A protein has these predicted regions:
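Canonical Radical SAM [4Fe-4S] cluster-binding loop centered on the CxxxCxxC motif
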Residues: 17-57, 69-70
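A short acidic, helix-capping loop that chelates divalent metal ions and anchors anionic groups
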Residues: 45-50, 114, 136-143, 204-209
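Conserved G/P- and acidic residue-centered "switch" motifs that form tight phosphate/ATP-binding loops
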Residues: 81
Length: 212
C-alpha cells in the first residue's frame, strides 16, 4: 500500500498496488476462543498469548485514530472470539465515536451475543457476522469440540432481535463433513439473514486433518 492525499484539507489516504483506496481494517482483539473448531485449533494444549504480548485496548484505540486519519472508515473486530476480550463493548464505543469512522462490525461465534447484543448496539456496533458451520447438533459438537448448537442459534436470534443489519452467517465448507447446505438455505426463508459459504483452506496444523 502507499499513502496519498486526494485533497490536503481532507488528510491522507491509503491505496493498494492496484490504485484502489483502502478504507477497511480488521482488528483481532484476542487469540483466545471458547471453541476448539477442528479446522482452526488443536483440541488441547493451546497456549494463548500473554496480555503483555497483545495490544491493550488503549493501543488499539490509538491505531484506530491513526487509521481513521488516513481514510479508514470501516472497522471489523475479530478474534479468536472477540467477545471473550474484556472491554470489547467499550472498545466498540470508542471506535464508533472516533471522527471519520462510519461503520463498526463484529465477527463472532455468537455464544455471547445474548449477553452483549444490546450493549453492543448501544455502543455503536452496526452489524455482525456469525460463524456457524452446521445445523446438526451432533455435528456441531464434533466441529466445535465443546459447543452446543442452541448457543449459536440463540446468538443469531439475539442479533436479529437487537436490530443489527445485516446479520450474516458464515459457514466453512468441509468436504468430509457432508454438511446439509439446504438446511442453511431453509433457515434464511423465515429469517432476514445473509448466508455465506466459505471454502475451507487446508493450512497449518489443520491441513489434511479429519479427511478435509
Amino acid at each position: 500500500w502507499r499513502v496519498g492525499a486526494r485533497d490536503p484539507s481532507k488528510g491522507a489516504f491509503m491505496k493498494d498496488s492496484h490504485g484502489r483506496v483502502i478504507d477497511y481494517m480488521r482488528i483481532s482483539l484476542t487469540d483466545r476462543c471458547n471453541y476448539r473448531c477442528i479446522y482452526c485449533m488443536p483440541a488441547d494444549g493451546v497456549t494463548s498469548l500473554c496480555h503483555s504480548d497483545i495490544l491493550s485496548l488503549e493501543e488499539i484505540e490509538r491505531v484506530v485514530r491513526v487509521a481513521a486519519s488516513m481514510g479508514i472508515k470501516r472497522f471489523r473486530l475479530t478474534g479468536g472470539e472477540p467477545l471473550v476480550r474484556k472491554g470489547a463493548v467499550d472498545l466498540v464505543r470508542a471506535i464508533h465515536e472516533t471522527p471519520g469512522v462510519d461503520d463498526v462490525s463484529l465477527t463472532t461465534n455468537g455464544v455471547l451475543l445474548p449477553k452483549y447484543a444490546e450493549e453492543l448496539a448501544a455502543a455503536g456496533l452496526s452489524r455482525v457476522n456469525i460463524s456457524l458451520d452446521t445445523l446438526d447438533p451432533e455435528q456441531f459438537r464434533y466441529i466445535t469440540r465443546r459447543g452446543e448448537l442452541h448457543e449459536a442459534i440463540d446468538g443469531i436470534e439475539a442479533a436479529l432481535a437487537t436490530g443489527f443489519d445485516p446479520v450474516k452467517v458464515n459457514a466453512v465448507t468441509v468436504r468430509s463433513l457432508g454438511q446439509d447446505f439446504l438446511a442453511f438455505a431453509k433457515m434464511t426463508i423465515d429469517r432476514p439473514l445473509h448466508m455465506r459459504f466459505i471454502e475451507y483452506m487446508p493450512v497449518g496444523e489443520s491441513a489434511g486433518s479429519h479427511g478435509c
